[in-house]
């Protein structure tokens, strides 16, 4: 971030307003000044771990290094020492629900996504250790609950629950029962962070990952317009996840999938939607608008099936790209042996450079592009909901 921007922010904010913001944004479990900084165990590559302070975490992220924060799961003894071999899942060789998906996709709304994202980014930050982060999660919980309440699914066992964490901001899980306990998961992360001064500066997080958050919320709304899904007649159970604390090292999703492993949950697939709204980088590079299908640290079978989904249900093509180790919450599912995949807004190198700053705002996003991600999400979930996995 450039120094003039910081100075402008400081001059523009009144002392009273800034004091109120800092108060709500201060970490809920802030260490006393005379105590040594708390250290966290991070994993930056398979088998490559190190102890770092919170400030060192942010420095590593500013340098572009991605990691798991495995402190809690390692202490509890729940973390596998190596990546487990994913369970064998036979994803469909062809798409079988084209007519239903295309009919439903016509009901997806850019306006809904815009309105939700405008409200979501109005929070000064969604920093996972702050009171404002709890407030933003509470607002999101209300939107998810309203989405379910407005559908038939509320009468057939669909529900939304919080998954609580020690740092304050909770994760959110919406469940739509199917005829079996085999489960199809779609996720995004709800937290945001300003990587320069997390406890002071604004972190609107429009693209990272407000865009994914509202994309899957809109896909959920339209999915529940299917009577078969809403009434619990799909073959498989469906879950939509909004994780807390992705920015801190995939903390929320690690906790969720750690518990799922302990409970022997039968998770057949997990798709992550993180950063779905920025297309200008691709266009500026002279390339065609597309979605970026991640090819590293993902399940190859699920990824191949997603390519078919994009080709069938989206109006733009896919490109193949890589994002590195522990680059988003799909990695947590993979870390515990569940088949996972990740689709983002573009090739990784063309993705938004405004993330983690005060400039990650709605005005830079393309809601037509987000609509393509919503189509892909809807198509994937609907096809897998009725598949024999």
UniProtKB/Swiss-Prot annotation:
Signal peptide coordinates: 1-19
Keywords assigned by UniProt, alphabetized: Aminopeptidase, Disulfide bond, Glycoprotein, Hydrolase, Metal-binding, Protease, Secreted, Signal, Zinc, Zymogen
EC number: 3.4.11.-
Named cofactor requirement(s): Zn(2+)
GO biological process terms held by the UniProt record: proteolysis
Subunit structure, interactors included: Monomer.
Protein name as annotated: Leucine aminopeptidase 1
Gene source species: Paracoccidioides lutzii (strain ATCC MYA-826 / Pb01) (Paracoccidioides brasiliensis)
UniProt lineage: Eukaryota, Fungi, Dikarya, Ascomycota, Pezizomycotina
């Amino acid at each position: 971030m450039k120094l003039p921007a910081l100075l402008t922010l400081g001059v523009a904010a009144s002392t009273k307003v800034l004091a109120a913001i800092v108060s709500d944004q201060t970490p809920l479990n802030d260490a006393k000044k005379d105590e040594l900084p708390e250290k966290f165990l991070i994993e930056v590559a398979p088998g490559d771990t190190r102890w770092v302070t919170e400030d060192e975490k942010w420095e590593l992220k500013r340098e572009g290094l991605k990691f798991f924060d495995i402190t809690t799961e390692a202490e509890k003894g729940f973390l596998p020492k190596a990546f487990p071999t994913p369970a064998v899942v036979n994803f469909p060789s062809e798409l079988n629900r084209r007519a239903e998906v295309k009919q439903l996709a016509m009901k997806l709304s850019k306006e809904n996504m815009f309105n939700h994202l405008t409200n979501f980014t109005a929070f000064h930050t969604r920093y996972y250790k702050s009171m404002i982060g709890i407030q933003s999660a509470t607002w999101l919980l209300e939107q998810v609950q309203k989405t379910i309440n407005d559908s038939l699914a509320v009468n057939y066992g669909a529900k939304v629950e919080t998954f609580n964490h020690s740092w304050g901001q909770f994760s959110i899980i919406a469940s739509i029962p199917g005829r079996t306990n085999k489960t199809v998961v779609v996720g995004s992360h709800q937290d945001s962070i300003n990587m320069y001064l997390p406890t002071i500066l604004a972190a609107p997080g429009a693209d990272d990952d407000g865009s994914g958050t509202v994309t899957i919320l809109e896909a959920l709304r339209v999915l529940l317009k299917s009577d078969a899904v809403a009434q619990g007649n799909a073959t498989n159970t469906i879950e939509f996840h909004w994780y807390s604390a992705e920015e801190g090292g995939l903390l929320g999703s690690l906790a969720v999938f750690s518990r799922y492993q302990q409970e022997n949950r039968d998770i057949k697939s997990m798709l992550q939607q993180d950063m779905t709204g920025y297309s200008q980088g691709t266009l500026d590079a002279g390339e065609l608008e597309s979605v970026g299908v991640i090819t590293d640290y993902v399940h190859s079978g699920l990824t191949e099936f997603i390519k078919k989904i994009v080709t069938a249900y989206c109006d733009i093509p896919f490109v193949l790209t890589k994002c590195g180790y522990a680059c988003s919450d799909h990695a947590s599912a993979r870390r515990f042996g569940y088949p996972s995949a990740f689709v983002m807004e573009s090739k990784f190198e063309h993705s938004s450079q405004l993330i983690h700053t005060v400039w990650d705002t709605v005005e830079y996003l393309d809601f037509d592009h987000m609509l393509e991600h919503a189509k892909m999400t809807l198509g994937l979930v609907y096809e897998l909901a009725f598949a024999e996995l």
